[in-house]
Amino acid sequence: NFDCFEINFHEKSERIINIQILDEIIDRLIFPFKKFDITTLEYKPFTRFTIAQSLDDTTSGKLSSFLNLILRDRDTGCFIIGPKNYSSKTDNNFLIKLATAVTHLIGNPNHDAMAGKYYARFHVKHEDNSDSYLRKAYTNMDLHTDGTYVRETTDWLLMSKIEEKNVEGGETAMLHLDDWEECK
């Protein structure tokens, strides 16, 4: 029972669980999330677990169990989580903290050698001349554990999209491994 979330299947796949955080929970997270700036989160690992605990406390400890259950279930294995309503309270820093809290409810993230942080962050633009396919719009971005920029074993990958504006062709698409044509 999650009174503070709206939970349903994604409109295009029952393998993807949509979790929308209601305003009352967002309001309860503002204070604990403001205690730490992004730089503090980057340099002090315990602060990441502190904001994760704040998020989990809003659900009496049920959110972490639910997220881990989804990830370990082959029939789902995927969720999309975020505020139901976006406002000035849910700015980029808030969303980075929310993504940090979610990842730390699931486990201890690997250190990304390329970014030099516990997370990698980049902008995707309509036109991009970089050599990284990660920054190119309208290309498939396959989440996989081989070729990640870490030295540790990687159990799963999480991707958090902070903002999407003026996209040509619609929203980002997400497919479960079992839905790929080449895997059938």
What are these regions (language model features)?
Residues 1-184:
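Non-heme Fe(II) oxygenase catalytic core, chiefly the N-lobe of the double-stranded beta-helix
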